[in-house]
Swiss-Prot record:
ATP binds at G30, S31, G32, K33, G34, T35, R145, G190. It is found in: Cytoplasm. It comes from Caenorhabditis elegans. Catalyzes the reversible transfer of the terminal phosphate group between ATP and AMP. Plays an important role in cellular energy homeostasis and in adenine nucleotide metabolism. GO terms for molecular function: adenylate kinase activity; ATP binding; nucleoside diphosphate kinase activity. This is Adenylate kinase isoenzyme 1. Its EC number is 2.7.4.3. The keyword Amino-acid biosynthesis does not apply. One of its GO terms (cellular component) is cytoplasm. The lineage of its organism: Eukaryota, Metazoa, Ecdysozoa, Nematoda, Chromadorea. It catalyses: AMP + ATP = 2 ADP. Keywords: ATP-binding, Cytoplasm, Kinase, Nucleotide-binding, Transferase. Signal peptide: none annotated.
Length: 210
């Protein structure tokens, strides 16, 4: 049996009272979403949260929960969705205390159930920004990145497997939010500035309704 993680009782009243907008950011490795997130944060003053970073930070912290997470990952099991959600909630509450104007939640949700759980326990996302790039382009970008970073083990086969995993897990998420009218599909094949112009147009429209 896989190790378990004890859940915390988290008071979300300050977060709900703040009523700030939440945006989910979805895009494959090499889609350029990291660069776009940096630009969005600089322009709008939103708080950028990455569920992967929050998990890594908790493991590094040496806390009892971090030790439980390490045990789960070492056993080859997946970290339960609700544990990731607790980490996100705690990070959001800390940011609200510091006066956050809203959130960009990166690499989230990874599956439909994760998005539904977030929205039922916290609040609905205003928009889901999907940075859409053709698979061939992603492979080229990742191979180029591997050469320049010295990660020669990132060969075409490994990269294609990573992309396949991303596409198969993310397709239902994209379809789900598209059906709810919340998905903004951004063609992320162009220049950084061209892509950002599309992002800004959509975020301005969404935030003007607040």
């Amino acid at each position: 049996m896989a190790p378990t993680v004890e859940r915390k009782n988290i008071n979300l009243a300050p977060l709900k009272a703040a009523g700030v907008p939440i945006f989910f950011i979805v895009g494959g490795p090499g889609s350029g979403k990291g660069t776009q997130c940096d630009k969005i944060v600089a322009k709008y003053g939103l708080t950028h949260l990455s569920s992967g970073d929050l998990l890594r930070d908790e493991v590094k912290s040496g806390s009892p929960r971090g030790a439980q997470l390490t045990a789960i990952m070492e056993s080859g099991a997946l970290v339960p969705l609700e544990v990731v959600l607790d980490l996100v909630k705690e990070a959001m509450l800390k940011a609200i205390e510091k006066g956050s104007k809203g959130f960009l939640i990166d690499g989230y949700p990874r599956e439909v159930a994760q998005g539904q759980q977030f929205e039922s326990e916290i609040q609905e996302a205003k928009l889901v920004l999907f940075f859409d790039v053709a698979e061939e382009t992603l492979v080229k970008r990742l191979l180029h990145r591997a050469q320049t970073s010295g990660r020669a083990d990132d060969n075409a086969d490994t990269i294609k497997k990573r992309l396949h995993t991303f596409v198969t897990s993310t397709a239902p998420v994209v379809d789900y939010y598209e059906s709810k009218g919340k998905l903004v599909r951004i063609n992320a094949e162009g220049s950084v500035d061209d892509i950002f112009a599309v992002v800004v147009a959509n975020l301005d429209k969404a935030t003007s309704k607040l």
